Structures are given as structure tokens and as C-alpha cells.
């Protein structure tokens, strides 16, 4: 209400005699005044009539408050006339009831009948966005501001009625007929009780209402009043309530006749009483202001004391009166001290002289109230005498302080006040004239003084008027002419209108013509046609100019420039994200059909152009004014110029008074002026060289020069001045803008300077500075500012995006990567691959072309400019060869290949359509279909390398931190250019800290081959990398995943060495990224390689695993203690289950296992201890050993938990990883063990997950904690968080594994010699890096559950291979486990990914779940704080349900989620770069845990697992998938190995034909064990891939629980293969399911501070249901991808998955076709930020295809994809998982066919999907790798012995559904997931429609 004033006019018709009575005039003037003061929109008014004399009249209409306007005023006049007309004769006679009673009754009705306190309809609950300052005010702040600004004027009742003036009238008013009998005067209290009783006062106070009485007494009655006691009594009463009386004269001013205000010069006195001319001389507004805001105005018109000397006859001593003087105008000169006023004489008929030569100041004289009453009476008597005689006194005013006396005239003003008019010094002659006259009378007494002075002064006065000097015109001639026509001009009019008119060029002739026009009668036809034509033309001209100005103002005031606010958009803002995305997609499809040519609606463009032109013009005009005002000096010599400039420069830096902007502008302008040249270009070139040589300093120079010399403020000021100088160069020398290289150089320098500023100032300061830059330069050089934002990795603000050219967001401009692959790279592709890729390329370019025209043709109702740019790079050449070489080369080689594509970007724009941008290393990855690749920036921290094992340091020059990742599969419009990446990295490099390297990661793992592996393992990893057999391998790691890997590594390092990374500007700007990367530092080299070869999911897995290991190990450790006490028992009872838990808990082991799987021969079997120590990455041997230990450890989860060695192993593992960054780190060797461990852990983890839904939660907490550690924002203990962070980061990688195989965590633990108990220890060590995780596990059973959860996660991963089917089962088992552990509720909730977010919340909510949830939340909050809001939410999705769902949907969701996450992240406020990458990575960290839970049971654990798994899920984007694949590759093997003695490795290989080929290899038991260990890890990785995918989904789901829905279709197979193939993954920004978050109010999120409901931004990313639906099948296949996608990613992943699938289809035709159709549609939507729904291909088919592809890769999707060997491997993995989980998996499969593929995975995946996507697409579970799907895979004959594989695509779904139902039986999550999935299905159909 503070924003709007409610005004009620309460009109007493008894005092109204005629329609044009004072009441009407007062009402009109009052409303005019209010509207002028507050604005028409801020005043709402209404009126009410009553009769104070009791006369009956028709009831007054009660209309609500309305805005001021002519219509409402007409209503008032009509009602007034009707009442006056209806009034019967005699109605004016007073009745028996007193007037006060009627007035009181009317007042009470007014207060009670109207809604004074109703809020504005337009903004019922929203804070008002003030136009000034553009800041949001809450209700209290708004009220306070309104009070301050409006002087307390809130709501008001204006009582328009005659006010009693005399005491007798007051008596009659209060007592009515009794007044005759009552002679006793009324006391104020009696009057108050009658007029304003306490009840009325209370109501007024409660509603902030003030009562003002507008006196409408007729003037004749006013003068007839004998006294004014009644008036002052009423006035005093009103003052108590803040009101007052507004006198009648206030409203009649300006309407008086001339003879009443100005006496004629004849000297004949008017016999009619009239107010002082002074009253009419005061402007009405000023009078009303003074009355309404008395206290405020008193401050503006300060009173001073004075003394009035009256000469007394016969006395030398003059009588003195104390008086107070109050200025009448604010601008007049004030007296400095008490003033002496001496009366000299008197004058009659004096009026203010109208003379330009006469200057006057006016003061009001009053007798101070505090002085004795006798003096006041005398003063009043003097005033009344002067009024009666109409005399004025002449006085000499002595201002003191040596100033000469001044002549003044004292005039009567009111009953107790006079006006002193002082003539200023220039009227000396006039003053002396008066003084001489007055002096002659000085000796007479006061009485005679008056009469005598009158005579003399009258003569003086005649002389005065005749005096030509004094009569000189004081105003222009035309004004005199106007005044001569009429004397009725009011002072207000003269004061306001004439000056304005004069300034506008009015002349006598013009005014004369106006008079002539006015004089002509309306019906006179003599007016010439030309006159009328002129009038018409003038009116048109004025109207047009007015309209144009209005348009410009509207443009300026529009909040979102260039984006029309349509009813549809307004409506959609209130929808859930999923619905919104659905409708956007639907409308966009319509728009595409309407504009097939891609021509966009031009309305927006035109509006934009107009706005830009208008703003540019304004900018130029403003600049012109500034330049004119700055009076540029002219210099004769260059030395003078330089001296002047140098002087100015120093002053600007030294003093804060000079604005740096104006100083820079002035200096550049001065130089330009000095270099006068006729040729503009020459001038600009000379000016630039001058500025460059004399003014500009580089950031390096500044850093060196300012090192110790200046204080921080000066440093910052100089940096800012340098920024302004460069921007001014661009602005004032436009020719610079024609040279892109120069602009780029300038932008880079500005970026460096801003980073320098960040060394001493926080990010908020930088934001303010950037806003200032934006405000100053948006109109002139928006493109340069846009590049600056890109360079900083910041999201482009809406208002800047509105003015940027459309080409700015296209690949050609900003997204071009500085390093494009050599053309020769294309030769790697086979002919068939080229054909397929050409088809895809055609699709890409077609969409890209449309995008360039206006990206996607959006329905005009929702058309808006896309902001987020991510680069998806699609390598033209298959990356396989390169990856394989890199893989073989060793982890150390990984960095080298990565260097080819070293990108320096904080935020990477993924170029989905630009294959040229791929680096050679990525190009060769997939030969069939070019798979998108990821580029990651690694920060090598030399100082950290000492703290960590140097295995990696040798590779990456020390501990490497994964800073950024670029995923090739991201739509172009969401990509960040490589140039940006380089710039950002460069910027980071400017920091004396770590070196930054770019690690390119492609879905294909080129580096994988580099690892020393047995051919079989190589093939497995290769298939994973290329075909994404287990999404971890095939799925490109998302940047987030990479980050998480790096974070995990860093976490491991931290675990080993709990030292928090140093905070630097880099940390500030890219903290999230760098933090996670820091975890990766150990695995940084690995990551680099891993990122590349991570495409060989192994490294990914390994990387992630190690991180996860660190994170998860500790996480699991911690989880295990908490949840694992039970879980431990369970684990003890069920070694497999135990393993699962430990695996999840021991992310490092899982990672190691995965690594072992990848390089089983080299590392996996070499040194188990090393593996443990080295963490998955370095632990090829360690992994092998680890795997067995893991297997054993799972048996003794508690032991594992308790084992400090585990923790140290975990920590050591990262070191180990460092030691052998390339080889060991590479999961190549470790994978076997990882597989083994994974398998072992898978089942246990599954069980754990089952039991551990809480554990998952706890794990999630733990993971979150770990994540926190990596995250600079981590809220938990810094050091432990660091450890946790490392762990979390590792865990995230592990989560990828975990998601792949919940075993992964256990495996990690095993690998790290950490049994479930040991993981607890690890967690315990989390405070130290390792201990924290362990502690967390111990701390929260939930965490343990979380650990368990990862196991299910692992199964999904295994499904990729063998684990996938198993994971579903494990989820059931996990649930059972949870129940067994007395955590069923938790397990149930967490295991209910199917139900989607809700289940997750449920699980979190359950006691265990809550514990895990809280722990996870805390961790999560850290991670989330790191990730940002979006990620937190996502991570929180870690609830089991989400995880399971995630697992399933991971691939697709991974991508979608990744994008969604990025988007969320951005929305969350993370830097775009950080957002895109860090969120993924962080999500990976946290999501892994979620992913694990994503495995249904793992869902709770999933949080923890998600953390580990998440990296891979996050990887779901091409990049994320690559990482996930990498992680999963290693991980799946591990899970396989772990699961069963007979292990089959399924390798998805991209054939030359472009079709993916599944290779199923049989792994010997030893390898299998290793694989199992790795598999457990891989399951974490693989299910991590699935669950990880799931987890990312879950993770995102936590941010937005929707992810689970989306990912499945794109899971590992499609995601991995396509991604690796370079296929583009469409990321459905808008597809991010919002369902998950809303449905999962898990305690995790609550604790983490992350909303379980999707954040608005997250919601915005909700994947349309349709999109989610079709990919769902594929996602089921792409279980891991799904989880990776996470909810944000899920949405994008649908398209992204599709695109991934597409790329995979390049490798795999079957997948390709469906993908293509999806991609086509996706692409178009992609432009919109929403994947287009595949109209062409049936959603389910597409999903199926993708699913099959994914499953094929996973071993779950399609049987055809699973070669016997691969299926066997999957089986093996699954067997391992299913050892414990199998029954449940089967149950899940049986229960929900749909979940069959998803069951385990389903928990997270579906949950994620459910949560992530409002549509039931989640329900469809994408059939990627749900927990059930994993189980189905596990059970499938191919994948598992004794198990029939469920149909990979359709069956997988069915199995998944079945498994899920079984899961559902076990846990409500399953059922919930089931329900949600169907919903998703419907959504998908809707989208297609």
C-alpha cells in the first residue's frame, strides 16, 4: 500500500449550495495537487456524500478506490449534481441530531466500508521494483521508503465540510439543538469525543489513515464570524492524529477578481473585506505542502529570531518585541544573526512592485508562542489595526555583521502574522526615498505615525508608480502585454507558466495571434483554410512528437529490452518448468511449421533496433554534453599535452572525487582534439597510438609496479582507469572495432585487469564495476562488452543480450575455437562414417543456419533471446584412433593430446555443430560418427603437487585441477568459444598460481589405448570410449564430470593433505571450477588424459573414481558408519552388498577399480596396494589388489569403514594417482579391479543402497561434503571439505563409477584397501581429506546408505556392461538392505527414484534418509554452494529415487542435465563457465552420490554416490558423457569383474560404418575380480555412468529432481557412443525436468539449503516430457547417460542424448536414425534452449533406439548392441552386483517392466527423471539404465550367468519396469518412479503433438 495512496473525499452536501461551490473546486484542486505530487498511478481515490444536517438523500454509491482520471471525476460531478438536484426544500435546515454525530457516522462508514489495506492487484505479493534504482524492496523497506519520501502521507480522508469557526458555531456543531441551552464552553476533550472518538482513532491508526478537514465555509460567513475559537479547537484536535484544516482560501486562490486582490491605483479603498494579497501571492502547491507536511517544511524554512523596535512618543528608548522570522522562499538570502527591525513609518495601498530593478526577499513575522501573552496580544492588535486600516509599515532592517540597513515593508498577513518584504541592495534610490519619508515622522508617537506616514507615503507611492526607473518592465514585453489583457493571473500561474513559455520562445506576435484566435467566435467561418490547415498540421506535429517521445520512454523503461512480454509468456511464467518447456516446445514446433524457411518474426528485431537506435542517440547526446562540459583544453606542444594527461591520470588515481570514467573519456578526447586531422581514420589511428604509448599499462606492468607501492584502493582505481581507457578507445575510435584481433587483444587486457582487481576486491565489487561499464557502454560498444563478459566467463546480462547482434551468439563469431583440427583429420573417417556424419552434419548446419537467422524460430508468444552459450564440438574425425593412442600412451600422454585442444575458457561453449573446432585429439576419437568431445582446462598447481603424489604431477606439472570442460555435444548457442576458454585460462594463468592446461575429452577415449592394458581390456575400454559400452567409457565426460574428476583427485589430495586451495581472483572468478579441478589435480594429468581418454570412460571413471574414492571412500566411510552400521552388518552379511557400500564409500577404490579395469594388466594387477593408495587412477595394480580387498572389504564394511588405511588409501590413492597419473590413473589397468570391486560393491552397495537409501543420503552428504571440499564455496569445514571436496570430486568421478556400479565406492574402498568400514574410516579421515568421508559415513547411516546407494548406481553402470541389470536388482536389495538395516524407510524413499524427486525426498526424509540427507545436505550445501543453486538442487536429487532414475536416464539426462545444470548453475549465480562446468562437475561430485541412489536403492546413497558418480552423470553432456564413459569404462569393467567370476566386457566400438559395435569380451576371474573391484567402482562408474548419469540427474534432480526422467535413452550407449563418435548431443536446456525437484523435498536438499523444488532457472530447463519420453528408451539404454544428464541435463540430454545417440548412430546406424530424427527436432528446439521433439520418429521408438543403443553399450539396451562377450561382461558385472542385488533386481524387473532397465538405475534415474522432468518421461525411465534396467542387464543371459537378459531396448524397459516394481515392492520409491514414468510418457506425447 505504500506504493499507492488511498484518498477518500467525504463531502458534506449540507455545505454545498451549488455545483460550482467551494467544495467542488476544493475537490478538483486537491486531486490535481495529489496527482502532480505522487503521479496519477500512485493515487487511488473514491468519494462519499453525506448530509451533516440529517437531510435524507439517496444512498451514496460505494465504489472501490479507482485511479485518478477524467472518468472517475465525471462520476463525482454527476453524483454531486444529482444530490443537489434531489435535495428537497428545507433540507438545509438543521435537524435534531448534531452535525458532529452525522459527520462521525459518515466517517466510520468510510473507514469500515472501504478496503483501505487491500494490496495492489497488480502485485499482490511481489515487492515493487522501483523505477529509480531498480532495486527490490520488501514490504517493510517499501513502507519505510514511502514514509520517508512522502512525509508520512499514506491514506487520507478529506472531509469537505464547513468548519465551525466561532465558539458558538462549534457548540452548535457538537450539540445541535441543545446548543441554545448549553452556554458552557466546550472543552477540547468533549469535542474530541463527539468528532473523533477513540474507536475512530484506533481504526485510522490501524489503517494508516489521516483525517484532513477541507473547510468549505463561504467567504461571506467566514468574515462574519466573531471569533475563530472553534476553528482553532478543531484544528488542534486534528493535529493529534497528524491531520489539519485546509482553509477555504487555499482552494480559491487564483480565482479571485482583480479588484479583490489588486487595489486600483486610484486610491479608493475597497469596502469589501478581502484576504491579504500575500495569500494569493503564494502558490497553492506551496501552501498545501506546508499544511500537509508542516514538520518537513519547517526544516526547509528555518526560523530565525529578531527584534522589532517600535518608537514611542516622548521616549528615547524604543519598545522592543521579540519576533520570529520565517523565509517564504527557499532560495532567498538568510540573515546570519538575530535581526533588528526598526519601524520608520507607514504606507497605504502598497503592493509588490513589478520591476526588474527591484529584488525582494519576504519573511513572515510572528510573535513567538513561548513569549508572554501580553506581547502576543499587542502584536495581534498591531496586525489587526494594520489590517483594518489597510496600512503597511516602513522599516529599516539591520542584518548585522557590518551590512548596511535595508529597507523593508511590513504588511498584514493574517490575524497573528505579518509579512516583511525586504528590498535588496540594488534599489538604493528607492530605499532612500522611503527612509527619508519615514525619518521625518520618527519623533511622532505610534498612533500619529500611522496617519501621518499614510499621507507622506501615499505621495511617495504615487511617485513610485510614476517613476520610470521603477516601472521598467521586469518581465518580457509579451508578458506585460498578457498581464495588461487581464489582471486575474494568479501568482502561481505567473510563477510557473510565463517562465516556461518564455523559455519556449513566446513572443508578443505569437501571443497576439493567440488572442485573435481566442477572440474569433467558434461559429465564425471566416477563419481561413490556411489557418485551419496550419492548426491541424501543428496538432499532428505535436501529437507525433509526443507519441515518439512516449515510445522512446517506453523502450527505456522496458525491463527486458527486445523481448516482448506476451500474455503467453506471462502465463507460462507461472507454470512449472516441465510444463513451460512442454509448451515452449509445442509453440516452437508450430512456429517452425509456420516459418519453414527459418525466417524469424521481425517484430522483436524491429523493437530491438528502435531501442538500440534510441539508446545510441541518447548515449551520443549525453556524451556530447559531457564532452562539451569538460572544456577540453588546447595545447600547443605535445609536451604540454602529455604533462596535462599525466597530471590528470595521477589525480584520477589518487583522488576518489574524480570519476574514472569521465577522466578516461576526457583524456582520450583531449588527445583526439590535439591531433587535429581531417581524415577520421588517420586521426583515430594516431589517437590510438598516442593512448597506447602514453596511457595504457598492461596488467603485468601494473602488478610489478604496484606490488608494494600503492594501497589497494589506488591499485584498484588504476586498474579501473585502465579499463575505462581501453573502452573509451573502442568507443571514441570506432575504427578499432573493425579489427577483430585488436578488439580481442583489448578485451583480453581488460579481462586481465579485472582479474587483477579481483585480487583485492570480492566478486560483488567486480559485478558492480561490470554493471557500471555495461551502463556506460551498452549503447555504443555492446559487442565489445559482450566479448568482455565472455572472456570473464560471465553470463551475458539480459539487457546486453537484447542489444547484441544475433551473429554474436553464432559459431562464426564468438564460438570459434582458436584451434581447429587440421583438415587432414577428416581422413581418419571411413567412407560410411563420412556418409553418416555428413547426414548429421547436414542436420547440424541446417539448424545452425536457422540459428544464425534467429536460432530457432520461436513462437512469437515466447520468443526470447537465448543467453547461455555452450560449445559443443563435434569432431570431424573419429577420435578413436587418437584417443586410443593417447590411452595407450599413458596418463602422462593424456595432457599432451589435450594440449592440442587446450582451451582457455572458464565457461566452455559446446559446439554441437562445429566439427572443425575439435582438436585433433578429439577428431580421431570416433571414426564412424564424429563424436563430440570435451575440452577441459586443467590447472596445474605446482605448489599443490608437492602435497600430492607426484605421479600425476609429472604428467600435468603437478597436481592438476580440472577447471573447465567443453563438450562437443552442447548446442552451439550454448557454447563458449574456445577463444574464451583460452582467454579464461590465460586469465587464470595471469594468476601467479597454477598453470592451466586444457584437457579435451571426447566421448571416444583416444587415450584409452595408450594405457597399458590387455587387448581385451583395451578393447573394453575402447568400446566404452567409442561405443560407450558402459556409459562411463563411451559417454563423454561432461565438464562437470571432469571437474569432479579433478575435484576428486584434488579431494584425494586434500584427503591426503587437507589443505584448502588458496583463494585467489582465479578462485573467486572460477572458484567452483578450479576447486573441483583442484580435486582433479592429482588426476589432473589423468584428467587431461582422462578427459580425453576419459572418453575412454576409464580414465573418467578412474578419475572420477579416485575423486569419488576420496570423496566417496570417506563419504562412504562416513556413510558406512552412519548408515553402514547397519549397512556394515548387511555388508558383513552380504559381502557383495558390503562391497557395494564400500565401493561407494571408497570412491578411490572404485576409481581404481575402474582404472584397473581399463588397464587391468598394467595397473590393475600390478599393485593392489598402489591401487588403493594411488586411488583408482594410479591404481592399476592397486586396483587389482584393491578389487580383491574391495571384495573382501565389502564383506567387512565396518572394518573398511573403520580402517584408517582405507582412508589413507583413499587419500593415498589420489597420491597414487598422482604418482602414476597416466597409467595408473588411467582406469585401463585399474578397471579390472574396479570392475571386480564394483561388482562386489555393486551388490552390496545396492543392498547398501537399498538399506542405505539413507546411507545414500548420508553418502550424499558425505559426498556433498567432499564436494564441498572441492568447492571453494563449500560450507563445511574448509579443510575437511577440502578432503571431502577431493573425495567428493573423486567421488563424483566415482559416482560416475558408483552410478555405474554402486560397487564403485566399495571398490574404491577395496582398491584403497578400504572395506565398507574402511570407507568409513576414509570418511572419518574426511576432516583430513580421507577421514572426512569416513566420518561422514560414520556420522550418518544415511551416508552409509548413500554409499550403498552408489552400488545401485553401479549396477546401472554395470548394465552398461553387465552391471546394468544388476543395479536394478541391487536397488531392490539395497532397499531390502536398508530395511534389514532398519533403514527401509530411508532406503525406500531413497530407492524410489521412480517416484522421482518425491521419493528422494521421502528417503531423505526418512530417519536414515534424513541423516544422510542432512549430511549430504551439509556436504551438498558445500558442494552446492560450490555448484551453485542449480547444482545443489541437482545434487540433492541425490535422493535414492533420483539416483535410480538418474542412472537410467543418465546419458540423456546427463547431457540435458548438464545443460540444465549449467543453466541452473548460471541461474544459480555460478559463473557461466563455472556453471556449465562446475555445476556438472560438482553435480558429478554430489550427484554421483545421487546417481548411486539413482540406482533405486542407491538413491539415498546416490547422493553420496552421486557425488562420485555425478561427474559422469554430469558428463552426460557430450563432455559429461565422455567423462562418464571414461569413468564408467573403467568402472563397468570393475563391476563386471566384481560381479561374477565369469566376466564379460562389453565394448561399444564405433565401426567405420558409423554404427556402434558391441564387443563382449570374456574376462578371466582374476581380471574379473579386478574388473569387479573396478566394476564396483565402475558400477559406480558404470552405474555411475548409469547411476552416475542417474546421479547427475539425481544430482541435478536435487537441484531439480527432474533429471531422472530424461537420461535413460541417451545413457551410456547413445551418449557414449554418439558422444565419443562426435555425434552431437542435443541438450534440452528447457527440458530439465522440474518434476524431480518438486517431488523430492529430501532433507538433503533442505539441509544443503537447496530447494528440492527446481529453482526457477532449473525449472526453465525442465525437459519437455515428450523430449524426455522418446529418449527415455534410449535413455534406458543410456542409463548412465541419463543419470549424468541429471535433471537439468536430462532435459537437455533428451535432445542431447539424442544427439549423443545420434553421434553414436553415426557409429551405430540404428541409433543414428532415431537420434537423427530426435536431433533434428532437438536441434531446432535447441536453438530455443529446448530440444525439439522428434516429430518424425516416434518418441518411444526413438527412445527405444537410443535406449537400445544405450543398453547395447551398457549391455542393457539392445541385445544386438551387446555382443555375447559384452553381454557376458555385463553379466559378470551384473552377477557381481546381483550376487547380493540380484533377487531384488529381478524383482524390480518383474515388478516394473518399464523400470526393468531402470530398476536400480531407475531409482536415481527415474527419480531424477521424475524429479527432473515434470513429464512422466522419467517414468519411461528412458529405459536407459534404471536400477531395474541394470538388473535386467545383469540378469540377461548375455550379461549374467543364469540370468536372462531383458530385452535391451524394449525389454530393458519392461525389465526395468518390472525390476522397478519389485523395487517398488521393496521401496515406495520404485512405485513412485513407476507412476512418474508414465506421466513422462504422456508428456512426451504432448510434446510431439
From Swiss-Prot:
Q: Which key words tag this protein in UniProt?
A: Cell cycle, DNA damage, DNA repair, Nucleus, Phosphoprotein
Q: Where is the composition biased (Low complexity)?
A: 812-832, 1187-1197, 1339-1351, 1496-1508
Q: Spell out the residue ranges making up region: Disordered.
A: 812-836, 979-1063, 1098-1421, 1471-1508, 1520-1543, 1630-1714, 1730-1751, 1841-1875
- Composition bias of kind Basic and acidic residues appears in 1705-1714
Subcellular location per the Swiss-Prot or TrEMBL entry:
Nucleus
Q: Which Pfam families match?
A: Treslin_M, Treslin_N, Treslin_STD
In this UniProt entry, the residues modified to Phosphothreonine are: 1134
On assembly, the entry states: Interacts with TOPBP1 (via BRCT domains); interaction takes place in a CDK2-dependent manner. Component of the replisome complex composed of at least DONSON, MCM2, MCM7, PCNA and TICRR.
**Under which name does UniProt file this protein?**
Treslin
Taxonomic placement: Eukaryota, Metazoa, Chordata, Craniata, Vertebrata
